[in-house]
Amino acid sequence: MATALQKPGMVPPPPGEESQTVILPPGWHSYLSPQGRRYYVNTTTNETTWERPSSSPGISASPAPHRSSLPTTVNGYHASGTPAHPPETAHMSLRKSTGDSQNLGSSSPGRKQSKENTITINCVTFPHPDTMPEQQLLKPTEWSYCDYFWADKKDPQGNGTVAGFELLLQKQLKGKQMQKEMSEFIRERIKIEEEYAKNLAKLSQNSLAAQEEGSLGEAWAQVKKSLADEAEVHLKFSAKLHSEVEKPLMNFRENFKKDMKKCDHHIADLRKQLASRYASVEKARKALTERQKDLEMKTQQLEIKLSNKTEEDIKKARRKSTQAGDDLMRCVDLYNQAQSKWFEEMVTTTLELERLEVERVEMIRQHLCQYTQLRHETDMFNQSTVEPVDQLLRKVDPAKDRELWVREHKTGNIRPVDMEI
């Protein structure tokens, strides 16, 4: 998250740079930049310079081209005069520290230039991977959404990029679609159950082998009756599947797409605002560079005595350069505020999407568990429908059946004898 603008404090000269207390002209004060370079500020005119000012009013002890308006310090790093880039296109912009900015003058010949501290990609500023320490994850052990979707990703379908947040939204919408398709799958399962129950009930009314008699006939009648009982079990199973599995899956988060659309627009608006702020920063940086070049040109004119009005022009150029620096400071501040707001909303929203995904998965898991439970119950009920059949089949007695049939259909028990002559 961005921090507020920081104004460096006055510090004594570091060892090795100035061996004794520096006597500065009235109104001038000495400061250290975050990179350890000393610069000087005139608190009366807001003029800044890298070179120690002399006692002569308006002119520093060293060549004037090194004097400039000092850009703002944000998050501990100075913005530099890098070329502007249109915010609507994907691009990468390196931010160098003040020590690298040619517009702000060079340091002593033996001083090394500082490396880039930040890198800007699609208007979002990140720490430069070569110079900044590794950041601590917000939720290190959880593979959380809030840690892994800050950058944009190249769109495999085209030449553009897809925001990390957009990928999360796509996953949410895909999850909603999967939930809908699961509901449709259960509906097809219900249709199969209903059709199966209908066919079982119809078959149970079939008259085939209805004339079977005896204990086997009773067992056969029970077989047909068990089909009717099983049909009832499957009808109840299909009804419970509809009310306890299919319907909840279909109706879960009915307005989810609308909610996600609002969420998408909210984050997209913040991102657009960030891009607009970034464009303002680049415009202000370009303006500062132009003012500094103008100041340098007028200073060179003074050195070669081209005009009697050059010294007055230099003062005007310095005021304009200072104003340009102030404008850049204000634009960077507004940019950091916009990025901070986007950052906060990203963290809050991605954590909410994470919670919604956990909730969706858990809801589906519970209803699929309900499906398997109903399936187990159906199996038990089906088993109960065949138990009477098993009992009657164990009682089938061919001898008893023969007795009953003979008693009912006998034609006589007197056997024939031989004929007499």
Curated annotation (Swiss-Prot):
It is found in: Cytoplasm. Keywords: Coiled coil, Cytoplasm, Developmental protein, Differentiation, Neurogenesis, Phosphoprotein. Residues 1-117 are annotated as: Disordered. CDD domains: F-BAR_GAS7. One of its GO terms (cellular component) is cytoplasm. Residues 41-52, 95-117 have a biased composition (Polar residues). SUPFAM superfamilies: BAR/IMD domain-like, WW domain. The modification Phosphoserine is found at residues 62, 108. Residues 141-401 form the F-BAR domain. This is Growth arrest-specific protein 7. The lineage of its organism: Eukaryota, Metazoa, Chordata, Craniata, Vertebrata.
